[in-house]
Amino acid sequence: MAVTYEKTFEIEIINELSESVYNRVLNYVLNHELDTKNTRLLEVNLLNQLEVAQEVDLFQQPFEELQAIHEYWRSMNQYSKQILTKEKVA
């Protein structure tokens, strides 16, 4: 599978976004001293899901799949902002 500039650029964007989203949720969990073993907590489940999603080998994915993965991380970015903000207000 050939690696093109466009593919490498897309992978770099995905990596930056995924790290940002994951770190936002991780910081929330740590700052609120949530039990990371308690899978009843939405934030902990989200953190676990994001951790698994980061394990995908992006260089093995076709460009079309990278675009879908990028959209997943955009959605998780918006979702994590919404739920973590709601938690702060509540």
From Swiss-Prot:
SUPFAM superfamilies: Plasmid maintenance system epsilon/zeta, antidote epsilon subunit
Pfam families: Epsilon_antitox
MF term (GO), any: toxic substance binding
InterPro entries: Antitoxin_epsilon/PezA_dom_sf, Epsilon_PezA_dom
Domain of life: Bacteria
UniProt GO BP: negative regulation of cell killing; response to toxic substance
Keywords carried by this UniProt record: Plasmid, Toxin-antitoxin system
Quaternary assembly: In the presence of the zeta toxin, forms an inactive PezA(2)PezT(2) heterotetramer.
Homology family: Belongs to the epsilon antitoxin family.
Entry function: Antitoxin component of a type II toxin-antitoxin (TA) system. Neutralizes the toxic effect of cognate zeta toxin. Part of a postsegregational killing (PSK) system involved in the killing of plasmid-free cells. Continuous synthesis of the epsilon antitoxin is required to counteract the zeta toxin.
Protein name (Swiss-Prot/TrEMBL): Antitoxin epsilon
